[in-house]
Amino acid sequence: EGYNDWSIRFKKLKEYAKKEGAPKSFLDDIDQIETPIYAGKISKPDVLLEEGNIKNVNRNIEIIFTPGHDRTEISILDNPSQILFSGDHILPKITPFIPLEDAEDDMLEKYTSSLDKVYNLEQKLIAPGHGALIEKPYSRIEQMQLHHKKRSDKIIDLIGNSKFSGWEIVNLLFPRKLDELNLRLAFQETMAHLIYLENKGLIKHVLNSDTNYWEKVRQV
């Protein structure tokens, strides 16, 4: 319900950012966002695909549910050729953006679990949604797993023995000046990592009436 209603996404993002100490300029920028031209209305699907082999086709094709970059993301494995069509899940040069869908929805956990799932598939080549073919699929997946581990470790180190609002952590993690779009992406990506680390029991989210903040969990 409302999956492709971008106004709902923007409203949730603004509410969340305000509680994380985002400045008025950032909140005002969210109000100015227009629905992307590529985000047309989604028609009701004729067929709902389930994870597993596609039936009634003359080829061994398998649907792999790979949420993370998007909550409905799928990859498609052509078993005869062992080519994985990864969409935006695995890209050759960059790591896909992990969105802040909902404070209760751990999108980074979903993404890293999806990487683990795909790593265990028999594959010779990855055909991504953007960029060149990935000829060393397992190496690329390992690189992406390491990227998120390093970022998580860096956030833990940045917090140290202090406590910071989500917005302060964004500025620590991304110190150089970003344009409006990349600042929104950086905010959501940072929040996705914070939620992930909280669910791992490594940090905690302290909720205040004014601005929420994050701190490390004291190990006994």
Where are these predicted regions, by residue range?
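A general structural signal for well-ordered alpha-helical segments in protein cores
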Residues: 9-10, 141, 152, 166
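Active-site HxH/HxHxD metal-binding segment of metal-dependent hydrolases
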Residues: 1-54
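Short, well-ordered beta-strand micro-motif
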Residues: 56, 75-77, 215
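C-terminal regulatory/interaction regions
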Residues: 154-220
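Residue-level detector of conserved, well-ordered beta-strand and adjacent loop positions
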Residues: 50, 67, 215-217
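Generic structural signal for secondary-structure transition and capping sites
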Residues: 54, 123-124, 164
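Metallo-beta-lactamase
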Residues: 29-47, 60-152
